Curated annotation (Swiss-Prot):
EC number(s) on file: 6.1.1.17
UniProt short sequence motif 'KMSKS' region, positions renumbered to this chain: 249-253
Family membership noted in the UniProt record: Belongs to the class-I aminoacyl-tRNA synthetase family. Glutamate--tRNA ligase type 1 subfamily.
Organism for this UniProt entry: Bartonella henselae (strain ATCC 49882 / DSM 28221 / CCUG 30454 / Houston 1)
The protein's name: Glutamate--tRNA ligase 2
Amino acid sequence: MIKVRFAPSPTGYIHIGNIRIALFNWLYAQAHNGTFILRYDNTDVERSKQEYIDAIAVDLEWLGIQPDEIYYQSKRFNRYDEVAEILKQRGLLYPCYETAEELDRRRKIQLSRKLPPVYDRAALKLTPEKKREFETQGRKPHWRFLLPNFENDPLQKKRTEVCWNDAVKGKQTIDLASLSDPVLIREDGSYLYTLPSVVDDIDMAITHIIRGDDHITNTGAQIALFEALNAKLPTFGHINLLTTLLGKGLSKRNNDLSIHSLRADGFESIAVQCLAVLIGTSQNVHPYPNQAVLLEHFNLQDTSRSVAKFDIADLLTLNSHFVHELTYEEVKKRLENLSINGEKVECFWNAIRSNINKVNDAVLWWKMLHDEQNFDTVALEDRAFVRQSLNLLPEGTLNEESWKVWTVALKEKTGRRGKALFMPLRQALTGMDHGPEMGKILQLLGREKVIERLIIQGE
């Protein structure tokens, strides 16, 4: 049975790049009747926050992702300690006492000599006396995993290829001799990503690990750790990364691209899903109506080899497709939450929806119709025409037909036509050069407000 996982770190709001990984895993599980696990990577107890755990849960629910199982790494420290002890007893996890400054100095020396900045396993040469001396000085060891890239002497590395058939990129090869032994445990005893992740993947019987291709190099070391623990290897699949237009990686520090902020800004869930899943693939980004249809077009092998660049303008364009199709009943509650209510709200929505990119944009049009306006958009040469238009405004309650009657009368009286006829009236009544049909604007403003604005803008 297919079993995948999404393992976010709750140290901030997750962004569209994170959720892209979640959606790939979720859709893959759905396509194969598999199981989707949500695993919170919260071993960093200082930076992990409950508010972000809660936010991730809300984000996933908003995107239609329903985890089958939920785990917290912070509740599994005893298990990680147990595995770490096994590795120590087998000599596969060894203590190192170098400070960060010492390691940095070694890397700089290696680079100056045009050598790869790979850890030289100097800690393996330490005598028990030297270790005690470091301990007496107050140094605490960090612990490295001994990669199997040697025959008998770990100080004599040899080329050791680790190969796997990547579900996205095909055959991949990593030479373990080109890697530093990964640090699994920090000086303070806390765990870095690798050991808890591998132990969890083993214990939870994860069959497929689908993640960003920035993890490809890590995969070589992780495969070595899987094998050291006599575990069955999962299938790895590495998808291209999502970057900014400038090619920079997405960060939790950039809150503008967090799912939390995109949702608050009024983006549609399905728009975010379609862009996240289809960008950076051989498919066009298409506004599929729901997740079920998106699933029909999802194919892991369609992923491109090059990075995918995220442009908020693309998301806005895609979002507008969905907004223009939303009925009043579908947005009624959301409009109420935006303080848009009253007798004409349904008429208002039907008038403006094709002119907005997000539901939240309705607020701008609502304020334009109901608030006192101080816009000054009518050209001086058009103000006499605006004053004249007031005299030809149809009598009675204004409706959509009133616009046609009004403009025909103005055309006959003034000889104006086209833009010269319509634009000054639109500017006088809305302060804008574009927008909904003017017949609907007249109906929404009402006779009293139309007269008031024509008087002000004609002065």
